[in-house]
Amino acid sequence: MARPCFKLEKDHPLPLAGVDEAGCAPLAGPVVAAAVILDRGRFPRGIDDSKKLSLEAREALHGKLMRQARCGVGMASVEEIDALNIYWARMLAMVRAVEALGFDPAFVLVDGNRCPRWARPSKAIVSGDARCRSIAAASIIAKVTRDRIMAAHAGDFPGYGWEQNRGYPTPDHRRALRELGPTPLHRRSFGLVREVLAESAQPMLASAAE
């Protein structure tokens, strides 16, 4: 299958930033977005949708992109996710990622079907991380950044397996959540976390009634 290329980018003005995020589905941790401006004459080979790359390939490309491209990273915290909902938190992280570039790109391509509410010239591209090289590069920066954050927090909250599952709702994470309860990094607005919190409150409510 063909890798992402510049075909869908060539009709837009430069400098062009590709934007993508990582971490909408997890039960814990922030959502992280990245904005990347590639030098079309000098960029790492092998750029692809981060989901299609091995851990080793992502890490290697992350290092090369940080050296050879202009990269900005933005995040929305767990508190912001719970206050805004994941959709708007994702948009907020993208806005922050572009702002983190330090200057205004001439055009922005965003992965997905909708751009943030901003005045920037931009376009949303469905499956952009599989089609546009700049968005694919952003997917790598966002994914590796978020994975590192969750791996670092794994030592603070042992037992949840974040060094492996990165906060996603894997069977081991779901089991740990039920057995150990939520941490401050769990998203209270997400269904399973809400369910566990409600279950843990029931015995307390019963004893209070007695």
Each model region followed by its residue ranges:
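RNase H-like, Mg2+-dependent phosphodiesterase core
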Residues: 1-210
